[in-house]
Amino acid sequence: MSKFRPFLAVYIIVRQQQRILLLQRQNTGFDDGKWSLPAGHVEEGESALTAAIREAEEEIGIVISPSALKLVYTLHRKSDERTYIDLWFEVDGFDGVPVNQEPNKCAGLMWSDLQNLPENTQEYVKIALKDMQTSHYGSLGLDTEC
């Protein structure tokens, strides 16, 4: 029997007034063409905070201090091949201006009204952004019966 191990990922919510920063995925093999948040996997031996800081700098060129990150939501989800635990962090201040640092994996950036996300936003991202307004935890594709 193989040992079950979910993948841990971080999502970074960067706000500007009532808008959030989205990036459009490309050349990744997963949801290419769809809008999402800056995000990535937590590497072996890395804390979730460190991963969020690293991903923000790698993907959008901003520098975030650990004290500027607030954990606002946890999503436990199952995709076709993997199970994820996604930690969603909201950013309260950063240095720099968001720019597309990975044009090979990101077609562009945009600021979007949270209440009017693009039609082609990743479905689980839309669900999580809506759900986190009233809850701190959600699950998708899993047995939720108690």
Annotate the PLM regions:
Residues G29, R77-E81, P103-N104, C146:
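A short beta-turn/loop motif at secondary-structure boundaries
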Residues M1-L21, V72-T74, E90:
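Conserved N-terminal beta-strand and adjoining loop/helix that marks the start
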Residues F7, R15, D32, L37, ...:
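Short connector loops at helix/strand junctions that flank enzyme active sites
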Residues R19-E58:
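Conserved Nudix-box catalytic region and its N-terminal flanking loop in Nudix hydrolases
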